[in-house]
Amino acid sequence: NFVSGGFNGQISVIGLPSGSTLKIIPVFSVHPENGYGFSEETKPMLETSHGFIPWDDQHHLALSQTNGEIDGRYLFANANNTPRVAKIDLKSFKTTEILEIPNSAGNHSSPFLTENTEYVVAGTRFAVPVDGEGDVPIESFKENFKGYLSFIGIGKEDGKMDITFQ
């Protein structure tokens, strides 16, 4: 069973029915035990448009699917503090990609997958200004702030994530 780590930014793999922790998968936080977030391979994944963010509030998980059935290729996780989605490869049980989502604040409502994992859908928790600069008077909230849904495309062959449309 995969369990969200919440504020520790990690995922726990829990054995059932024993409840034993089988593995900790670092995702949105540094993990000194195995060097995650310190190595040349993993440190860039914790870089955001706001700089190096070595922690996050990881909330929800979703397993990849084929024809609506779990296929065991990937596990996707959201970050609530800085709007990001991560992909964990279930062959290696390692985080292989983290994508920051533009025009979003508080990526709580994600990840939701289409039935063949063509898209991961992520919704912003809070409305954001649509001017591209994020600098508009609060008095203009009704006219200038919107909530976005982001559709993150998943490459069929390589599983690479990209913002396809919002």
What are these model-predicted stretches?
Residues 1-166:
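Predominantly soluble domains enriched in secretory-pathway, periplasmic, or organellar proteins
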